[in-house]
C-alpha cells in the first residue's frame, strides 16, 4: 500500500511548537513514513501550506513525497517519475524518510546525468526521456534489505508527531567512525580562487540535504553488521495523548536537551563539524576558510560568491557577474553595510551599485525589504532560486522580532552571508552572533536556552550607537583596507598589517585648565554672536511681515481698478498670463486670458482679410492666364503627338523602302551572276559547236579528197561523181577557207 508523506505531517510549525508535550529539540532516531498513526492537528492552529503551484509529487517505492523543489526544477513538471526512475537506476535499494532527502538524491542524479540549473530545458527533457521505461527495466532489481524495512518500522507511529526541525543546542559528539564524505569526480577540478566561471556546472554532490537545523536520521545499510547498532539506537518515548496535551495549555515545561546526534548519512555533503565550519566561513564572507574550499563539494557556492561579492585578484578588482541578493530591514541604510561608494540604480526595483575609489564597479546589490505583514513563506519566496543570500544584522533582528526565522538560516542547499562587503563584515561581529544563535537553535528554543546571548545581540544591533559605529568605521577606516578583500587565506594578516601601518599618534596631550578657559571664553563669544544673529533674524522677520501686509493692502486698494481696466481693455497679448496670475489670481487671469485669446484670433482674421483682399483679383487673373496657358499647352502637345506620329510613319516607310532597295539590289546581283553564267555557257557551247563543225568539215574534206597516185599520170583524172543534189558551189560554200589552213 502506498504511503503518503505531506508537508503538513513533516512540518508542524506553530501548532506543534505550542504543544506542551512536544519539545522542539527532541530528535527521534527514526519515524515511520505513514501518516495513519499521527494524531490530527486542529485546522485552526495548523500552519498554512503554500499553494500547490510550486510543488511537485514524487512516488518512490510506493511512497509519495510532496514538497517545493528548487525553482530551476519547476519547468520539468510532468517528469517527476522520470526523475524517480533516474534515482532508482543509481540507488535501487535506497529509502528516504523526508522529502528533502529524496530531493537531494534527485538533484544529485540530475547533476550526474548533466542536468543542472544552467542546462537548457530542451536538453534536460531529452535526457529525462531516456528514463521513461525504467520502471519495467528495473522490475527485476532486488528489493530493499530487510534490515532497512525493519528499521523503518521499528519505531511506533506516534513518534512522527514529535518531528520538529530544530537544531540541537549541544553539538553532536564526535564519533570514532564518521560518515564517509563523498568525493568530487576526478574530472571536476576546483575553480580558481578569484575567477568565477559562469559556464561551470553545479557540483555533483547533494545540494538539498538539510543541515544542523534538521534532525539527523540514522544511515541505512544493507550489511548485517549494522543491524545491532540500529537496534541499539535510543528510542524516544511516544508523546502523550492529544487530549491530555491540549488540556494543559498553561504548561511551563521547557524544552529538553537532545541526546546524542546520529552521524549524517553518506549522502550528506560532509560531517557536522566540516559542514558547520563551512557555513560559518560563508557567514563571515570568507569562503577560503571553509574546510571544503576548492575540493569540488561546494563549487556552486564558490562560483556564486566570487561572481557576485566584491573581491580583488592581484591588486585589481574583479568585475561582478551576478547580483548580491540582500534581505534588509524596512528602513535600513544600505550604504552602512560597505566601505565602497553606493549608487542607486535607476530601475523599478531597489538595486545599488558598489563602486571602489578607482571608479570600478565591484558589485550590484538587489535589495528585498522586509515588512511587518510578511510571513515565513514570503521570506522563503524571496530566497527561492538563490543558493547564496545576504542578510543584514538589522534584518536578522527584525526577523527575530517578527518570528520569520524558521528555515531561513538552516538550509543545506543555501549559504547565508551576514553582509555584502567582506571587509565590513570583519568589523561587525554582532550579526555573526545572531547567525550562530539562529543556526544552532530554532527561535522558540533559543528564547529559552539562548535567551541571554540573543538578548545581548539584539540590544547591540537595535541600539542607536550600532549604526553610528558603522558610519564611523565607514568614514575612518584607512583607504588601503579596501584592497584587502582578496580570496587568499592570509587576509587576516593583511588587515592587521594595514591597521598597524595606519596607526596614528595623538598630536597633543589632554587639554589643561588654561586651554579649557580659552575654550569657554570662545564659547561665550560664539553664544553672544548667536544671540545677536537671533535678534537680527527676528528684525528681518518683522520687516518681511510688514512688507507682506503693505503689499496685501496695495493689492486690495488697486486691485479693483486694475481688474476693471483689464476687463474693459481689448488686448491681444496672450504672453502675460504668469504676470496676470500673480496680480489678479488664477480665476480672473484665466478669464482675461480667454478674452485676449478670442480678441487675438479676431485680430488675426481681420488682418488676414485686409492683406489678402487686394491680391484676390490678381490671383483670379493669374489663375485665368494659367488655365489658358494650360489649354494652349494641351493643343501644342496634341499637335506634337500628331507630328511625332507622322514622323514615325515616314521613318517606317523609309525603312521599308531601304529594305526593298537592298532586296532589289540583291536580286539584281543574283540575276547578273546568272546572266554571266548563262553567257559563258553559251560561249562555251558556241566554241564547242564551231570546233565540232570544223572537225566535221575536215572529215568531209578528207573523205572527198582524191588519193594521189604513186606515179604521176597513172591515175585517172576524172572527178568523182557528185551525189544527187550536191553541187560544186554548195560544197565550196560549205567549206570554210580558214579551216583549210589547219
Curated annotation (Swiss-Prot):
Coiled coil stretches, renumbered: 635-700
Keyword RNA-binding: yes
Keyword RNA-binding assigned: yes
Biased composition annotated in UniProt, kind: Low complexity: 20-46, 238-258
Source organism superkingdom: Viruses
Disordered, as annotated region: 14-46, 230-268
Alphabetical keyword list: Coiled coil, RNA-binding
One Gene Ontology molecular-function label: RNA binding
Family assignment from sequence similarity: Belongs to the aquareoviridae NS1 protein family.
Function summary: Non-structural protein with ssRNA-binding activity. Is probably involved in the formation of viral inclusions, where the assembly of cores and the replication of viral RNA are thought to occur.
Annotated protein name in UniProt: Non-structural protein 1
Organism per entry: Aquareovirus C (isolate Golden shiner/USA/GSRV/1977) (AQRV-C)
Amino acid at each position: 500500500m502506498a504511503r503518503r508523506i505531506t508537508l503538513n505531517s513533516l512540518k508542524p510549525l506553530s501548532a506543534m511548537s505550542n504543544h506542551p508535550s512536544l519539545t522542539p529539540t527532541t530528535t527521534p532516531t527514526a519515524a515511520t513514513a505513514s501518516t495513519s498513526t499521527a494524531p490530527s492537528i486542529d485546522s485552526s492552529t495548523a500552519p498554512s501550506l503554500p499553494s500547490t503551484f510550486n510543488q511537485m509529487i514524487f512516488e518512490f517505492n510506493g511512497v509519495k513525497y510532496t514538497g517545493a523543489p528548487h525553482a530551476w526544477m519547476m519547468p520539468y513538471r510532468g517528469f517527476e517519475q522520470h526523475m524517480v526512475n533516474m534515482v532508482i537506476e543509481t540507488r535501487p535499494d535506497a529509502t528516504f524518510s523526508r522529502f528533502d532527502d529524496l530531493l537531494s538524491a534527485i538533484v544529485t542524479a540530475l547533476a550526474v546525468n548533466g542536468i543542472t540549473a544552467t542546462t537548457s530545458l530542451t536538453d534536460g527533457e531529452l535526457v529525462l526521456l531516456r528514463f521513461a521505461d525504467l520502471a519495467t527495466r528495473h522490475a527485476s532489481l532486488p528489493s530493499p534489505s530487510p534490515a532497512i524495512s525493519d528499521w523503518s518500522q521499528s519505531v511506533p507511529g506516534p513518534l512522527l508527531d514529535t518531528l520538529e526541525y530544530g537544531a540541537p543546542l549541544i553539538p553532536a559528539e564526535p564519533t570514532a567512525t564518521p560518515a564517509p564524505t563523498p568525493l568530487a569526480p576526478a574530472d571536476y577540478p576546483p575553480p580558481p580562487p578569484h575567477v568565477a566561471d559562469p559556464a561551470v556546472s553545479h557540483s555533483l554532490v547533494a545540494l538539498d540535504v538539510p543541515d544542523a537545523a534538521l534532525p539527523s536520521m540514522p544511515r541505512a545499510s544493507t550489511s548485517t553488521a549494522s543491524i545491532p547498532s540500529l537496534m541499539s539506537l535510543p528510542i524516544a518515548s511516544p508523546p502523550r495523548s492529544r487530549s491530555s496535551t491540549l488540556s494543559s495549555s498553561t504548561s511551563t515545561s521547557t524544552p529538553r536537551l537532545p541526546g546524542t546526534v546520529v552521524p549524517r548519512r553518506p549522502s550528506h555533503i560532509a560531517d557536522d563539524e566540516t559542514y558547520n565550519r563551512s557555513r560559518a566561513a560563508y557567514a563571515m564572507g570568507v569562503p577560503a576558510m571553509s574546510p571544503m574550499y576548492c575540493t569540488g563539494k561546494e563549487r556552486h557556492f564558490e562560483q556564486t560568491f566570487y561572481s557576485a561579492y566584491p573581491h580583488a585578484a592581484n591588486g585589481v578588482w574583479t568585475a561582478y557577474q551576478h547580483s548580491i541578493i540582500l534581505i534588509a530591514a524596512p528602513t535600513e541604510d544600505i550604504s552602512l553595510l560597505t566601505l565602497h561608494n553606493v549608487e542607486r540604480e535607476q530601475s523599478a526595483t531597489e538595486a545599488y551599485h558598489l563602486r571602489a575609489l578607482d571608479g570600478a564597479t565591484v558589485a550590484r546589490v538587489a535589495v528585498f525589504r522586509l515588512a511587518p505583514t510578511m510571513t515565513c513563506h514570503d521570506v522563503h519566496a524571496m530566497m527561492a532560486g538563490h543558493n547564496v543570500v545576504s542578510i543584514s544584522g538589522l534584518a536578522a533582528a527584525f526577523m527575530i522580532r517578527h518570528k520569520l526565522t524558521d528555515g531561513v538560516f538552516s538550509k543545506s542547499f543555501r549559504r547565508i552571508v551576514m553582509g555584502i562587503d567582506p571587509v565590513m563584515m570583519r568589523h561587525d561581529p554582532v550579526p555573526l552572533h545572531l547567525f550562530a544563535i539562529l543556526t544552532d537553535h530554532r527561535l522558540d528554543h533559543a528564547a529559552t536556552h539562548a535567551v541571554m546571548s540573543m538578548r545581548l545581540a539584539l540590544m547591540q544591533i537595535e541600539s542607536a550607537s550600532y549604526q553610528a559605529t558603522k558610519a564611523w568605521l565607514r568614514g575612518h577606516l584607512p583607504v588601503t583596507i579596501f584592497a584587502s578583500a582578496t580570496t587568499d587565506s592570509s587576509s587576516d594578516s593583511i588587515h592587521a598589517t594595514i591597521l598597524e601601518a595606519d596607526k596614528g599618534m595623538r598630536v597633543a596631550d589632554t587639554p589643561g585648565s588654561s586651554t579649557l578657559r580659552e575654550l569657554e571664553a570662545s564659547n561665550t563669544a560664539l553664544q553672544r554672536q548667536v544671540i545677536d544673529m537671533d535678534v537680527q533674524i527676528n528684525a528681518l522677520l518683522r520687516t518681511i511681515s510688514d512688507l507682506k501686509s503693505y503689499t496685501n493692502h496695495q493689492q486690495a486698494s488697486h486691485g479693483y481698478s486694475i481688474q476693471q481696466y483689464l476687463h474693459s481693455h481689448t488686448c491681444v497679448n496672450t504672453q502675460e498670463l504668469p504676470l496676470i496670475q500673480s496680480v489678479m489670481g488664477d480665476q480672473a487671469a484665466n478669464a482675461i486670458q480667454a478674452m485676449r485669446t478670442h480678441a487675438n484670433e479676431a485680430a488675426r482674421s481681420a488682418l488676414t482679410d485686409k492683406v489678402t483682399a487686394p491680391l484676390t483679383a490678381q490671383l483670379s487673373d493669374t489663375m485665368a492666364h494659367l488655365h489658358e496657358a494650360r489649354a494652349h499647352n494641351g493643343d501644342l502637345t496634341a499637335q506634337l503627338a500628331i507630328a511625332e506620329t507622322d514622323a514615325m510613319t515616314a521613318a517606317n516607310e523609309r525603312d521599308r523602302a531601304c529594305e526593298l532597295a537592298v532586296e532589289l539590289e540583291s536580286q539584281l546581283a543574283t540575276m547578273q551572276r546568272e546572266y554571266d553564267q548563262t553567257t559563258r555557257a553559251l560561249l562555251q557551247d558556241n566554241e564547242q559547236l564551231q570546233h565540232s563543225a570544223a572537225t566535221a568539215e575536215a572529215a568531209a574534206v578528207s573523205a572527198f579528197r582524191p588519193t594521189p597516185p604513186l606515179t604521176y599520170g597513172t591515175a585517172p583524172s576524172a572527178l568523182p561523181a557528185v551525189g544527187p543534189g550536191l553541187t560544186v558551189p554548195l560544197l565550196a560554200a560549205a567549206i570554210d577557207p580558214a579551216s583549210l589552213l589547219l
